Amino acid sequence: CVCVCETIYTRSRSTTTTTTESTMESKESSESSEEVTFKILVTHPEVPKEALDLMSRGCQLVMCDSLPPNRTEILQKAKGVHGMFWAVGLPLDKEVMDAAGSQLKSVSAMSAGIDHIDVAELKKRKIPLGHTPTVLNYAVADIAMGLMLSAARRFHEGRNKIDSSSWENYHIEWMWGQEIRDATVGFFGFGGIGQAIAQRLKGFDIEKILYTTRKRVDKSVEKEFNAAKVPFDDLLSQSDILFIAAPLTPETQGVFNSTSFAKMKKNAVLINIARGPIINQDDLYTALKTNQIFSAGIDVMSPEPLPADDKLLSLPNLVITPHIGSATQRTRTDMAVICAHNVLRGLVGEPMLSPAY
């Protein structure tokens, strides 16, 4: 993520920015100097200023003001826009596209995942879609490591012991956790985020990495991380620590369920930084409640927000964070700038920086 913004500007200023600026210059010299070429719907009022400044060069921004974001407002303000800066997890579907109108020609999500977007409908309308993968790999990998350590070494349970004055360290086996050293670490999905996690694991003296993906990663990647592709059942049965780092698809939805948990080690630590519905949460609750697996750490869940009375929150061996994997100033700003460039490039018919297809 070093100098991401500089890289973006190097690749994009000669196309999108120049195009929008030249459009402004030509219009300034005409009688209709106050007219703008494009309208862009910005679905969130807190988009970083860097992205807003970029898009406002020659474009009119139609800002949504509601917090949390409101679908009714989005539908009302979408009318007549040419581009959409989609910074919410609400569905971007046919209704939204119809509300915008036939002039809609560019959409980008300020997210890596696009499971909330009707991709087929966008393709049908020949509208390009951008998103913001890669740039968030580092921040998400960091929180994955935090969840791993917290779940393996029982941080949440330990804090509860302090709060309830239940220190029992006179027992030799009190609060024993799982070590990372010599662990077999599994990855369900081994793309950019998975490999960023693997990079961080190099300092933990793990034994090896196993991964399950649709396609084998490059041999050089396997060599770098001492990684081997295995069938899903082998991943479940052999992993001491298992990271879920795959996209949500019809094939991955609910794949971690009672059948899967029954095949895992009793000392297994499960981490999910991908999408909540990949795990059947009722089955996860049972697996943790009955100590079928040792512990879990999740940054994603279903639904989001998770209700305060959800039974998952009663589990001492589950660490939960509120979907904050990319929540650093640097990463969110970079995501916003990339998203802005995607929208602008799509408007002028140029390839997006991060196209979804």
Predicted features by range, described:
Residues 1-9:
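Compositionally biased low-complexity segments enriched in histidine and/or tyrosine
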Residues 127, 133-184, 196-199, 204, ...:
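Phosphate-binding beta-alpha-beta segment of Rossmann-like dinucleotide-binding domains, i.e.
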